[in-house]
């Protein structure tokens, strides 16, 4: 089981670090627009949508990495005062909602991405970029976060049953 948990953590870490490089083209296209608009008085028709798509992929694909690092929003008012085992019991209950939501996102997002691909869907703008690449990020990101959620669930279950924490890689 430790090998599975470490593999999932490694996938989340590598995907997160890889996806973090999307900031470079994001900044580049925005900088290009600033220069084109304010220096050359020649704004583009493509930067806004391109930046949205890059940022969308960035946010969707970083979910698993952020989950692995414990970076998602948490209500700490009472939760932080509980012992680790009690927190794990609470987390086991909330994981059920997590799996439902992310499973639904994977399923419906996958359908939406597939339909978009088959239709060759494009944005209804002058630039008209294809939409399916960004829509494909939804099921991919959902799968990655589900996988990391499963690893967290197993760790919480192990803590509740044995009183000992399972191995973490970060």
Where in the sequence are the language-model features?
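Alpha-helical transmembrane segments and membrane-interface helix-loop junctions
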Residues: 1-170
């Amino acid at each position: 089981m430790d090998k599975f948990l470490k593999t999932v953590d490694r996938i989340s870490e590598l995907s997160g670090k890889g996806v973090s490089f999307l900031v470079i083209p994001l900044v580049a296209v925005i900088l290009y627009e600033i220069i084109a608009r304010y220096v050359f008085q020649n704004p583009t028709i493509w930067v806004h949508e391109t930046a949205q798509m890059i940022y969308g992929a960035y946010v969707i694909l970083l979910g698993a990495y952020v989950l692995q690092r414990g970076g998602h929003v948490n209500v700490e008012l009472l939760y932080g005062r509980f012992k680790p085992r009690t927190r794990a019991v609470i987390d086991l209950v909330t994981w059920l909602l997590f799996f439902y939501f992310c499973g639904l996102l994977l399923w419906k997002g996958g359908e939406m991405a597939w339909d978009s691909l088959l239709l060759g869907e494009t944005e209804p703008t002058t630039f008209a970029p294809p939409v399916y690449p960004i829509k494909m990020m939804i099921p991919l990101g959902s799968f990655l976060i589900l996988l990391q959620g499963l690893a967290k669930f197993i760790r919480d279950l192990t803590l509740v049953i044995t009183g000992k924490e399972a191995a973490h890689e970060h």
